[in-house]
Amino acid sequence: MARDSPSSADVSSGDFVLPYVPLIPYNATNPTGGDSLTQDLNVYYTSGDIAWLLTSTALVLLMIPGVGLFYSGLARRNLTFSHTAGPFIGNLENIGLKDVLARPSVGSARVPDLLFAVYQCMFAAITVAIALGALSERGRLLPSLIFAFIWSTVVYDPIACWTWNPSGWVYQLGGLDFAGGTPVHIASGSAALAYSYVLGKRAGYGTQKLNYRPHNVTHIVLGTVFLWVGWFGFNAGSALSANLRAVMAAVVTNLAACMGGITWCLIDFRLERKWSTVGFCSGVIAGLVAITPGSGYVPAWAAVVFGVCAGVACNFATKLKYWLNADDALDIFAVHAVGGCVGNLLTGVFAADYIAHLDGYTQIPGGWLNGNWVQIGYQAADSATGMAYSFAVTCIILILLSFVGRFIPALRLRVDRAEEEQGIDDVEIGEFAYDFVELVREVRPVGFADDGESEIGVGGEDRSHSRATMVRGSKEASGESYPLQAMGRTGAMG
């Protein structure tokens, strides 16, 4: 049985020969990432910083199902961080995690490359998850997975590189984006708008048939909770260290979320005289999006302004899709792209040098609070470039995939009209969040059957719920059938 270290008895008896040599201190300039057999790779780093970033990684991972729950409820029924890089994208020095082990990361010398890579992988994943909300009710799954890989490589990676890599043009210009206002939110929101254009409008768009109504408020609340909790890892974790700057990022994140939710809810109440749970949750997400770029730069009181401005701007931006003539079913562009732009611009106003220096080493000229009037221009340039690049390249990717789909039916971006009417869950997955067949079996009277047959159709094939009919018991012998009708409030069928 193998043992990690010799026991005291073995050493005292003199019968044990040490199977190892004392490890030498790790040389952080080693280009290979270190050798754990000859070097102590742990002494270079603080265990608290590593523990915090590991926790933040898990929190950001939690955001991915949070996005799924949030948008499913709303629906109707890092390769860029190279140590040597250009101003637009990194290189392939560390492809396949080559030599990524204990060398200090380009993001911070306080955490190793390997941990930083995993953390940034979560950022790329959540960004793609947000953008793919544009598939709602009409997009195919397989081509979207191919799109996700291509998009994260040629859209997310370059934007993340020019924003955060010390060699990136926005970084060199002086743009401030602490946790992803442009790479994550503006990029994903713009991509969702492009995806909506290329896919086209849903069947029945503009008619009462598509009158918007969230089908599951519980999912929306659960998704919001997941996202809210995960955002602490998203923003505070971007400090890449357990320090006061991370604490301040957590504080402003929570304040902006609260104020965004309250503001959106108040706007909806003014129009509808209802305290909307969906409105509050949407406002929370808007506030979280807006505070993302400024979370490590702005004081606590400024977070209130971020939340209020985001709640107002994103609420009214939900009407932009009609002006843009786009079927953005889940308002991803309004909340993420517009919210990201609001956050970027407000960061240029409220960024404070003393907040950034809470980590002990970051120095910035600040924003308007420090008299740096040009900062908002840098922020606007970053926002506009990120939006234009993401939208244009996303359109190119989708047009190419659509062209390929003409020859390979499985890669068609959109389901056909009949499949759309049948439902994406049925056509693409064959599984359902809610089994209406079971509901029918529970509520129908004894003697009713589907299509005049037993619950298992001819040849043992299950009857599809989409074609279910009911036979009145009194006419069962004749086999006369009637379409399945909805149950009224009194319990009667009609």
Regions found by a protein language model. Name each.
Residues 2-494:
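Glycine- and aromatic-enriched membrane alpha-helices
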